Amino acid sequence: MSLCINPSLIRQYLYCPMAAYYIAAGAPEPPTLRMQRGREIQQEAAQAAAKALGAERAEYSVHITAPPLCGTVDAVLWINGRPSPLEVKAAARPRRIPIHHKAQAAAYIAMVQRAYGRAVATAYIYYAESGQIAQIRMAKDLQELLNYAVSRLQQILQGKPPVLNPNPAKCQNCWYRKWCSHLPTTVEKI
């Protein structure tokens, strides 16, 4: 297992630690239609967001290694002379931005800041389905959450599984459900 922690893995960990464990163990969920759609529209959506935000310039699909974090930022936008990461989501903007989306953005902030050697206080999430942009600012509580998730993921990458914590609302449609055994399968209910 790699010791590089991708911001997507941080997002997944905060949504469901067991799913992050399976991904880190080399068993990623097969791409869903939404995932495939997201990849297809990523460049076009990032360009639309850059234009909407008035970016002076934009770099697309930027791979950054800033241990323990590494991954590919959908775009790095230069706004008012400062770099800001942009994450593209295929979905519509939710009423409240989920904390796992904010933590993923925080990880990109940390990576871009380290890679570019410039202070980065803001990340953007472009929700392509609705064409809306969320601005995520790095705050102390978000930094603490990021540090916590990175610490837990480092333990997972060293082979320590997370504590099982079933959530029926999340587990019901989860691809990893067959391995977690949080919920009985349909056959077991009969």
Swiss-Prot record:
It catalyses: exonucleolytic cleavage in the 5'- to 3'-direction to yield nucleoside 3'-phosphates. It comes from the Archaea. CRISPR (clustered regularly interspaced short palindromic repeat) is an adaptive immune system that provides protection against mobile genetic elements (viruses, transposable elements and conjugative plasmids). CRISPR clusters contain sequences complementary to antecedent mobile elements and target invading nucleic acids. CRISPR clusters are transcribed and processed into CRISPR RNA (crRNA). This may be a 5' to 3' ssDNA exonuclease. Its EC number is 3.1.12.1. One of its GO terms (molecular function) is single-stranded DNA 5'-3' DNA exonuclease activity. Its cofactor is Mg(2+); Mn(2+); Cu(2+); [4Fe-4S] cluster. InterPro entries: Cas4_exonuclease (IPR051827), CRISPR-assoc_prot_Cas4 (IPR013343), Dna2/Cas4_DUF83 (IPR022765), PDDEXK-like_dom_sf (IPR011604). It comes from Thermoproteus tenax (strain ATCC 35583 / DSM 2078 / JCM 9277 / NBRC 100435 / Kra 1). Pfam families: Cas_Cas4. Mg(2+) or Mn(2+) required for ssDNA cleavage activity. Can also utilise Cu(2+). Binds 1 [4Fe-4S] cluster per subunit. It may be important for protein stability, since mutation of the Cys that bind the cofactor leads to a colorless, insoluble protein. [4Fe-4S] cluster binds at C16, C171, C174, C180. NCBIfam families: cas4. Keywords: 4Fe-4S, Antiviral defense, Exonuclease, Hydrolase, Iron, Iron-sulfur, Manganese, Metal-binding, Nuclease. PANTHER family: CRISPR-ASSOCIATED EXONUCLEASE CAS4 (PTHR36531), DNA REPLICATION ATP-DEPENDENT HELICASE_NUCLEASE DNA2 (PTHR36531:SF6). Belongs to the CRISPR-associated exonuclease Cas4 family. This is CRISPR-associated exonuclease Cas4. Mn(2+) binds at D74, E87, V88.
